[in-house]
């Protein structure tokens, strides 16, 4: 079922599926059903704050169960060792370590939580001044956002609507386009329907598919060369985030042939009209069809950074759920959680969002809550696929103005250094960052919990339930809890890159310093 | 007496080993302000209790175990404690500092200090659990080496569920039991090595002490203390000496530098270099033998080595042991030194005195003064020698008395390398005359640290003219004063090395460093003034974090000037109590080899101009020509009652 | 030949104990001329090394037992020792 091109309106979703609990079989009338025992809360365990621990070993001395150890020195003479809970099972939760620690880096709490005192962000005179600078910057950006002209792309929606695209392109006067996609989709024949439709209407095309998970500056240069040398006039980005971002960067390069990709990375460095650009997402998703960002890895330095400019926001999008039916479960999971990450980060960020973006975030979260697991377990479920596509669209539009946060900043470094797929990075990192923000995000996460029908007495409780739900989703969809492959020697570089990307642009709930990033990365390294 | 200051537990006790009675020993806040704790507190206690007639091996001799107020607060490197007593080696008081966990647990039991007098009627070990003191028979422990003793103590400290209690411990080995004059006391892997404190334990039939408790050391301002600790820790870890050299090379890293400066004593201080130094230096130790570096509780520097001996990871040697058992006896085999270091620790002896006495014996044999079969470079019998010494067997019985007594018996006083009866520590002072002064005037005998450790400016860290006497006396006094207070507060002396701004170390050829090195001999007058008017220096130096921690953790106001003055007082208290036992200028000596024989026959300056240095030093200290504090000095230091 | 020996942390960092060089063949007339040769050797031993000239400047330079500077001249037969400052006790 296809529809007329919609301009700057929200796409229609399938009626939201209400989660209806299965009816319990009625117990025999004589015996009232026994109330299930409330799950026993696990014992508090020591949270030892790795970045601020000085390795004095006083806690090790105080522990009666010998379940705290000093980390292994990384080289002979390494003195930057720190205490850690080496045997959680042995720990009896006595709190002697917390009492003994002279610098208050140990606090007893529920396993997996980060006590509030370590979530306030690094404090020092320099850091406090820097935080003020960031907030002033963001306040100015907020005003500037009003002049940015964010919009929803014009779009067509519905099963099979991809076949209409060539006709629409031809009606704009174009005769040749470059289709940017990835080799995997080509092999699977996913774009074949588009190619046939283009042949039918006589629209010429070239295909550029030399793109990996995280497109590189070399990919962009190669794609642009093909675009220019074959006389293409427009671009179709067909696929997930990688072809989308690559195509956007090719469009930017086409607007500025003499600039390198690195020179266009950052804020507002394109500011020129690009060639006609259609975005056809086949994942749900990066939302890249609605965003002003294109994330490209520099081939020489492996630094992943974003071109951020409203100029590269696609003018048109094609939302055809049939294109996502064949997505393997793991891609469904990772891209779905990527969409969730967009919605959550945008919503929890400070000041940039207007009521529209907040509303879109909430809608996206609810759609993901209702549909992602279904889409993961039953890929052929049309409604789930369609709703996930819409969710990704909403979330993408939301973060276009609301921005992303440290989940993305750190995730990009993993993509650059270890080639970790963006969606996987987002899925894994999201719950850890939200937990580390602590009370700063309780209210907003509680709103999202409300949207999903989660209950709780306090906002803190609801927020923690929401984070627990994210972890649960990851577990159900076989997404790992952390990244043990992160090497210690890469951490300084990761922190430098993440800070450069996020501070001061991203209006994150808590502005982090080096120790805060170390805390997160340590959590990622050690999460099991 | 309870204290208004934090950091102190408020209780000092005296335990009579003869009658097994415990009494409280009065200790006021005024005394805490003047003497802080640690070795200074011990000296004051000995000053008030000794008449000068006491003998080391007597019931009247006290063993004074003191902690510092910073122990238990978490300050960097603050877990050190002190054992002081009348030394059987020097016959004057000695203080012996240690990084083991005993002091930490003594405070958890609720005590700032423990004074022992009397004598156990039988072989005993003392168990302290909070304020409960229980004496146990130690026949099953007597004869065991220190490691074995500590393992056996573990069995005695297991809870019904099999878990080991947490406690601190002291133990002597066979050397202490047999009253080897330089027997040590071991705490975990660390040693109260010098001065023969272990022999006093042994004479008193005290094999071991364990202590545990559940009290908390109070901290005045936990938040400010925490921030200061974090800041100080970062500073220490980023300093080239404390954060790079000490962890990666340990004190062993000095061997090559000493060789280059001619300060590496070899063949019993006949020479200042050793041709095979590269086989027994810190680099070889790091590259081929070190397993991991370890640290005392709360220490960020983690300078201790761990090596493998007989397939077991054990504590590795410090610089002095490497020097004295390497070039000192012409042994180029590092593996032997590692083995001997372990054996000596296990037997419970001071590695420095043991090695230096051995070297004396080798030279005496070589010169035909004493036929003992010991030869430089002959190393196949040395393990047996240590065992014989510890058990006073054969020539071991003679070696057990140290080089001073041996030289009095056999001759060769000029090459019995000791001062006041305690052997010197491998740094050859004829190429670092300021260190030579320090050795001679050190209160406990031939100690390089108590002597001011001037080698750090005479060629190892900085490199001012090592042969001039100018300014050396004043520098010695300043460094001694600072280090006294560091020790008294419970911290490790190595924290003071970060006093030298990092760029002076990382830019040895830089303009400022060059100027500083050239200027040092000319600033004696300035240092004299600083020492004289120290209380006026009511400031804190950014390179010296030790002062602010006093106000934050203890609530005791402290400035850089007051810190120096407190150290000066400490040094004088020690001098006072030793003067009761006859110490004066005639005791501040070095063997003639170091004062009369140039190390380089072509350079007459390569010997220690001790008399010149002493003269200046006494003046700087405010002592008379006899090397004793004047009344004016004592009054200035608040010690007027001892005039 | 000139004999160059490394000690202290500098030796641990470069993983070089020492080496010989022919001053005339290598164009070495001062200590500073040895720097590129030493850095090249350090790179050969450990391609990932971050040792640079600044680290050599951080060493005490001793030529034939006498402390010197990097501008000091060196001759055939000289022994040069590079040593990091140390402390202990």
What kind of feature is each model-predicted range?
Chain C
Residues 1-88:
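Ubiquitin-like/PB1-type beta-grasp interaction modules and other compact soluble beta-rich domains
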